[in-house]
C-alpha cells in the first residue's frame, strides 16, 4: 500500500486523469455486471415456483377456509369410519403443512423480487443463496403435494363405503379398519374390491342367521311329557344342574350321517382363539374363505378351516344358540316374528320355566385353592366395540387341550360371560357318572389385571423375577393362611440417589403445535390489510411492509412515507385497537436496527410455550452463559436465554395473575437443570409462604425457606457478612472474582465456593416489616456481591416507588415487567411505558444493559406437577455438604422474636433435647443451628429455639454474624445446669 501511495505521488495531472477514467470505467463495468446479475437472478426467482404450490394453496383454501371439500366433513366414531377419520385428519394436517409451506415460500419469493429491484452486492449474494434454498424447498413441496394428491384421490367416496361397513357385519368393519391402519393407500385404491367383499360378507352373515344347523335343534312339537320324563330321569340338584343335564342331552354328538356341511358347520374352537389382546377379531377367521391371501380380495367359496378333526367331534359353545331363559316368576312374553327369528328353544324354555321349582344355590366357599382356580382369560369385547385397556386382559399361559368327551364338561358354557350372571365354575366337572352342580363364582376372568403404575423418574426400580412370579389373589379374596399379602403392584420404594442433574423425563411431554397455524397466518395478513385501510382513512402515508407472528403477539412493520412523522402514527394506537377489535396495541417506534415502526397486536389464539420446549431448545442446551436462565420466546420465534452472571441481579415485577410467580419458578428450575448443589446454592425468602416453600428440602438450599419477615432481615444481613467473608478469602489468594478463586482452589485440592443466588419472592412485605435493614442489605449485595458469585432475584407485585426505591433500582439494572395497571407502574419498573399494554399470562418486557429498548417475550409455563416431580427427585439426592459445614452459620439470622434478646421468662426450658444440644455444642467446640439440625435430626425452627435456650442459659455466646457462636462451658459443667 505504501508503495502504491509513493507511486501515485509521482503522477502528474495527465496520469491522474487517466487513472480516474480507468476507475470510472471499472466502476461502470462493475455496476453493469451487478445489474445484469440481478436481472438474471430476478428472472430465475420469478420462475422458481412450482405449479404444485399454487394447487396446494387452492386445496388449502377449499379444505380449511371454504370447507367445501370432502376432507372438511368429520366422520363418526364408529369402527370403519373412525379409522377413516384418522386418515382424513392426517390428510388435512398434511395439506395445512404443505399449503403453509407454499405460502411462505411464495411470500419470500415476492420479497426477493422487490429487493432485487434495487440491487447491491450484498443483496445479490444474499438472494442468490436464498434462491437456491427455496428451490430445494419447492421441490420438497412438489413431492409432498403429489403424494398427498394421490391419497386425496383415493379418499373419494370412501366415507359412504365406511358407513356401509359400519352398518354391516362387525367382522367386516373390523377388518377394513385394520387394513386402513396398516395399508392406507393400497386399501383406499381397492375400493371396488372392498365393496365386493362387503357384499359377500353381508350375504354370508345373513345366510348364517337364517339357516342354523337343523340337526342340532329339538323338534318344534316337543311335548310337555317328554320334558317331564327328562326331569324325572335327571338327578336332583339346582337349577343350573338340571339345565346343564338337559343341554348335555340336547348337544350329544351327531352320527356320521348327521354332520353338517362345511358351508354351515361352526368353527371348532374353544371360543378364545380369535380374541386378541388389543386388536379386534380378524375377519380371516370369522369369514372363512374371503381372506385366504392378504393381497387378493377376490371372494372364494367358503370352506371349513383346515384343522385336524377330533374323534369324536367336539362342538363349540359359541355354535349353540343362546337360551332365552327368564328367571322371574311370570313367563317372558314371546317375541313376534317381526322382532326376532323364531326361536326353536322358546317353547322348551317356557315349559321348563312353568315346571321348575325354587332350589337354593350352593354357597361359594370363602377360600379357593390356587390349583383349583381356573386360568384367567382375556375379557371378550362386545361386538362393534373397540378393545380398550379396560376390557382387555394380558395374555395368559397357553391352554392345554382337553380330551374329547361327550359329557357336559367338554362344552365351554361360560364363553359369553355377559349373558350369564356368574363366572366359570371353580372346580372341573367330575366324570360322566353324575351331572355336576354348577357353583356360581365371582367373575375372575372378566376382571382385567391392572397395569402397574410406574413412578415418574429417570431411574425406575427394577422388579426382581422372584417377585414377578408370585401369583396374587383376586381383589375380593383374603390372602391364604401362611402367605403374606402381596404389595400393591406399581408401588416401588425409592431410596436415596447420587447427585445428578434432573432429567427431562420429569417434565410434561412436548405439546403439539397449533393445528391452525395456516389459519393464524391468514388472519395476520388480513389484519395487515385492515391496518393499511385504517392508516389510509386517517390520511397517513404509511403501509405495512412485513410482519412477524409470535406466540402471543404479531408485530407489523409499518414503513412511513418520506416526511411522515412517527408521532402521528403512534398517536393512533387506540384507533388501531378499535379497528382491529383487540384490547390494545403497543407501538414500538422505531424498531431497533430497522427504519420501520413496529405495531404489536395480540393474537386471537396463543401458541403454547412450555418449559420442556425451552429446555429442548438449542439456545439453552448450547449456551455458554455462566448462569443461564430461560426468559421466554421472542416475537421472531427465537428462545431468549439470559445470563444471570452478566446481569448481575434481576428485578421481576407485575400485577397479580400476570405470570410473575411462574417466571420465578422458571428461573429457579433453569438453574437446577444446569448446576449441582456443589456448584450452585440458593437462599430463598418467601413471606407469602406458598410460592417458594415447595422447594424446601432440596439440596441446593443453604437453609430452609425463610417465611418470617422478621427473620428475613437477619438472613440478608448474614448474606452480607458471608459476602465480606468471601472477599477476605479472595484477597488472601489474590483472586479478583469467583472463577479465579475456584481455579486456585482446584489447583491446591481445596473445596470450591459455589455460586449463590438469593431469591426474594415478595419484596413489599420485607420493606414494610424492616425497611432500613432490608434496603441497606440489598443495596450492599447489589453493589458488591457480583465478584463473589452472589446474585439477587427480587420479585414484587407492588411496583410502587416506596417499594422499588431509587437505591434498589440503580443497583439492579436488569428488569422484567409483566402486565401492570397503569403507565406510572410501567415507568417505575422499566423507566418507560409499555407494560400497561401487555396481555398477561406470561407476556413480559425484558430489559438489561446493552439493549436499546425492552424486548417483548412470552415466558414459558411450568406446571406445579412438574415442579413437584423435580423437587421430589432432588430431595432424594444425598452428598457431603462441605459448604454448610463451613459457612452454614453465616445464614442463621434471627431465629425467633422471643429469643435471648426478648423476654426470657417466656422461654420453655423443658425441651428433652436441651441437654443433648448442649453436649453437641461442647463436642463441636462451637454453636451452630445447622449442626444441631443434623446431629439431632430436628427441623430448623426447633434447632434455632434450642440455640436460643442455650444462649439464655449462658452455655453459648450471642450470635456474631458470620462467625459461629462461642461455647462458654465445658462438659464437666453440665451437671450444674441439668443435674446428674
UniProtKB/Swiss-Prot annotation:
Q: Which GO terms describe its molecular function?
A: ATP binding; ATP hydrolysis activity; DNA binding; DNA translocase activity
The keyword DNA-binding appears for this protein: yes
**One Pfam family from the record:** FtsK_alpha
Q: Does the keyword Zinc-finger apply?
A: no
Top-level lineage group: Bacteria
| Stretches with biased composition (Low complexity) | 464-484
The UniProt annotation places ATP binding at 654-661
Record region (Disordered):
201-292, 366-495
InterPro entries according to UniProt: AAA+_ATPase (IPR003593), FtsK/SpoIIIE/SftA (IPR050206), FtsK_alpha (IPR041027), FtsK_dom (IPR002543), Ftsk_gamma (IPR018541), P-loop_NTPase (IPR027417), WH-like_DNA-bd_sf (IPR036388), WH_DNA-bd_sf (IPR036390)
Q: Where is the composition biased (Pro residues)?
A: 375-385, 395-406, 449-463
All copies of the FtsK domain together span: 636-827
The entry's function note states:
Probable DNA motor protein. May track DNA in a ATP-dependent manner by generating positive supercoils in front of it and negative supercoils behind it.
Q: Tell me more from the record.
A: Although strongly related to FtsK, it lacks the typical transmembrane domains located at the N-terminal part of FtsK.
The protein, known as: Uncharacterized FtsK-like protein DR_0400
Question: What organism is listed for this UniProt entry?
Answer: Deinococcus radiodurans (strain ATCC 13939 / DSM 20539 / JCM 16871 / CCUG 27074 / LMG 4051 / NBRC 15346 / NCIMB 9279 / VKM B-1422 / R1)
Amino acid at each position: 500500500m505504501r508503495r502504491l501511495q509513493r507511486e501515485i505521488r509521482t503522477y502528474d495531472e495527465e496520469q491522474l486523469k487517466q487513472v480516474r477514467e480507468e476507475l470510472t470505467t471499472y466502476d461502470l463495468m462493475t455496476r453493469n455486471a451487478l445489474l445484469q446479475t440481478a436481472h438474471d437472478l430476478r428472472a430465475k426467482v420469478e420462475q422458481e415456483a412450482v405449479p404444485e404450490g399454487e394447487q396446494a394453496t387452492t386445496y388449502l383454501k377449499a379444505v380449511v377456509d371454504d370447507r367445501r371439500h370432502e376432507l372438511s366433513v368429520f366422520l363418526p366414531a364408529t369402527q370403519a369410519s373412525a379409522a377413516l377419520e384418522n386418515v382424513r385428519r392426517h390428510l388435512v394436517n398434511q395439506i395445512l403443512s404443505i399449503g403453509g409451506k407454499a405460502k411462505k415460500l411464495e411470500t419470500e419469493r415476492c420479497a426477493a423480487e422487490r429487493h432485487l429491484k434495487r440491487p447491491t452486492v450484498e443483496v445479490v449474494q444474499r438472494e442468490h443463496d436464498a434462491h437456491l434454498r427455496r428451490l430445494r424447498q419447492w421441490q420438497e413441496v412438489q413431492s409432498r403435494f403429489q403424494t398427498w394428491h394421490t391419497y386425496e384421490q383415493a379418499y373419494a367416496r370412501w366415507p359412504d363405503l365406511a358407513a356401509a361397513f359400519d352398518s354391516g357385519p362387525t367382522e367386516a368393519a373390523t377388518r377394513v379398519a385394520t387394513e386402513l391402519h396398516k395399508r392406507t393407500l393400497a386399501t383406499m385404491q381397492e375400493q371396488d374390491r372392498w365393496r365386493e367383499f362387503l357384499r359377500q360378507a353381508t350375504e354370508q352373515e345373513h345366510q348364517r342367521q337364517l339357516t342354523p344347523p337343523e340337526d342340532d335343534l329339538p323338534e318344534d312339537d316337543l311335548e310337555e311329557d317328554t320334558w317331564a320324563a327328562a326331569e324325572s330321569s335327571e338327578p336332583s340338584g339346582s337349577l343350573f344342574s338340571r339345565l346343564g343335564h338337559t343341554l348335555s342331552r340336547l348337544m350329544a354328538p351327531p352320527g356320521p350321517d348327521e354332520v353338517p356341511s362345511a358351508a354351515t358347520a361352526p368353527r371348532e374352537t374353544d371360543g378364545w382363539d380369535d380374541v386378541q389382546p388389543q386388536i379386534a377379531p380378524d375377519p380371516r377367521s370369522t369369514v372363512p374363505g374371503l381372506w385366504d391371501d392378504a393381497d387378493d380380495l377376490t371372494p372364494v367359496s367358503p370352506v371349513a378351516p383346515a384343522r385336524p378333526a377330533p374323534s369324536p367331534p367336539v362342538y363349540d359353545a359359541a355354535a349353540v344358540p343362546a337360551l332365552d331363559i327368564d328367571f322371574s316368576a311370570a313367563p317372558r312374553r314371546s317375541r313376534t316374528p317381526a322382532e326376532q327369528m323364531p326361536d326353536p328353544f322358546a317353547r322348551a324354555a317356557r315349559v321348563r320355566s312353568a315346571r321348575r321349582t325354587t332350589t337354593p344355590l350352593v354357597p361359594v366357599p370363602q377360600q379357593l385353592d390356587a390349583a383349583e382356580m381356573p386360568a384367567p382369560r382375556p375379557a371378550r369385547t362386545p361386538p362393534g366395540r373397540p378393545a380398550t385397556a379396560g376390557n382387555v386382559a394380558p395374555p395368559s399361559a397357553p391352554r392345554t387341550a382337553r380330551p374329547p368327551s361327550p359329557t357336559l364338561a367338554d362344552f365351554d358354557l361360560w364363553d359369553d360371560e355377559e349373558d350369564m350372571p356368574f363366572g366359570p365354575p371353580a372346580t372341573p366337572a367330575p366324570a360322566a357318572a353324575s351331572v355336576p352342580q354348577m357353583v356360581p363364582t365371582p367373575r375372575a376372568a372378566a376382571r382385567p389385571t391392572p397395569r402397574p403404575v410406574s413412578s415418574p423418574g429417570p431411574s425406575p426400580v427394577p422388579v426382581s423375577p422372584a417377585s414377578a412370579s408370585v401369583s396374587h389373589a383376586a381383589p375380593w379374596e383374603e390372602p391364604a393362611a401362611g402367605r403374606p399379602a402381596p404389595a400393591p403392584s406399581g408401588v416401588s420404594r425409592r431410596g436415596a440417589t447420587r447427585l445428578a442433574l434432573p432429567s427431562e423425563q420429569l417434565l410434561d411431554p412436548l405439546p403439539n403445535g397449533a393445528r391452525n397455524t395456516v389459519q393464524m397466518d391468514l388472519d395476520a395478513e388480513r389484519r395487515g390489510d385492515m391496518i393499511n385501510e385504517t392508516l389510509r382513512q386517517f390520511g397517513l402515508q404509511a403501509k405495512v411492509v412485513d410482519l412477524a407472528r409470535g406466540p402471543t403477539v404479531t408485530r407489523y412493520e409499518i414503513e412511513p412515507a418520506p416526511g411522515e412523522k412517527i408521532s402521528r402514527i403512534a398517536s393512533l394506537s387506540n384507533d388501531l385497537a378499535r379497528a382491529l377489535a383487540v384490547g390494545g396495541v403497543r407501538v414500538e417506534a422505531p424498531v431497533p436496527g430497522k427504519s420501520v415502526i413496529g405495531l404489536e397486536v395480540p393474537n386471537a389464539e396463543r401458541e403454547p410455550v412450555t418449559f420442556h420446549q425451552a429446555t429442548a431448545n438449542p439456545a439453552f442446551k448450547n449456551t455458554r452463559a455462566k448462569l443461564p436462565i430461560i426468559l421466554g420466546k421472542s416475537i421472531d420465534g427465537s428462545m431468549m436465554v439470559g445470563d444471570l452472571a452478566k446481569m448481575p441481579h434481576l428485578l421481576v415485577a407485575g400485577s397479580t395473575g400476570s405470570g410473575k410467580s411462574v417466571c420465578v419458578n422458571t428461573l429457579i428450575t433453569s438453574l437446577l437443570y444446569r448446576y449441582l448443589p456443589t456448584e450452585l446454592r440458593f437462599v430463598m425468602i418467601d413471606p407469602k409462604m406458598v410460592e417458594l416453600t415447595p422447594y424446601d428440602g432440596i439440596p441446593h438450599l443453604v437453609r430452609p425457606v425463610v417465611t418470617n419477615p422478621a427473620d428475613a432481615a437477619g438472613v440478608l444481613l448474614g448474606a452480607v457478612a458471608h459476602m465480606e467473608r468471601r472477599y477476605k478469602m479472595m484477597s488472601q489468594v489474590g483472586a479478583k472474582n469467583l472463577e479465579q478463586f475456584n481455579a486456585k482452589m482446584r489447583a491446591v485440592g481445596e473445596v470450591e465456593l459455589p455460586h449463590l443466588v438469593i431469591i426474594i419472592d415478595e419484596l413489599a412485605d420485607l420493606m414494610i416489616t424492616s425497611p432500613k435493614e432490608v434496603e441497606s442489605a440489598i443495596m450492599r449485595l447489589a453493589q458488591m456481591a457480583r465478584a463473589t458469585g452472589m446474585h439477587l432475584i427480587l420479585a414484587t407485585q407492588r411496583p410502587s416507588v416506596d417499594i422499588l426505591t431509587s437505591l434498589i433500582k440503580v443497583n439492579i439494572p436488569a428488569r422484567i415487567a409483566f402486565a401492570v395497571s397503569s403507565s406510572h407502574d410501567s415507568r417505575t419498573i422499566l423507566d418507560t411505558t409499555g407494560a400497561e399494554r401487555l396481555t398477561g399470562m406470561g407476556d413480559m418486557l425484558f430489559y438489561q444493559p446493552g439493549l436499546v429498548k425492552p424486548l417483548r417475550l412470552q415466558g414459558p409455563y411450568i406446571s406445579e406437577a412438574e415442579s413437584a416431580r423435580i423437587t421430589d427427585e432432588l430431595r432424594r439426592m444425598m452428598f457431603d455438604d462441605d459448604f454448610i459445614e463451613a459457612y452454614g452459620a453465616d445464614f442463621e439470622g434471627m431465629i425467633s422474636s422471643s429469643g435471648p434478646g426478648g423476654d426470657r421468662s417466656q422461654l420453655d426450658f423443658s425441651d428433652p433435647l436441651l441437654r443433648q444440644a448442649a453436649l453437641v455444642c461442647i463436642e463441636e467446640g462451637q454453636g451452630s443451628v445447622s449442626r444441631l439440625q443434623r446431629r439431632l435430626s430436628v427441623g430448623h425452627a426447633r434447632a434455632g429455639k434450642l440455640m436460643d435456650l442455650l444462649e439464655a442459659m449462658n452455655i453459648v455466646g450471642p450470635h456474631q454474624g458470620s462467625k459461629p457462636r462461642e461455647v462458654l462451658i465445658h462438659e464437666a459443667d453440665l451437671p450444674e445446669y441439668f443435674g446428674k
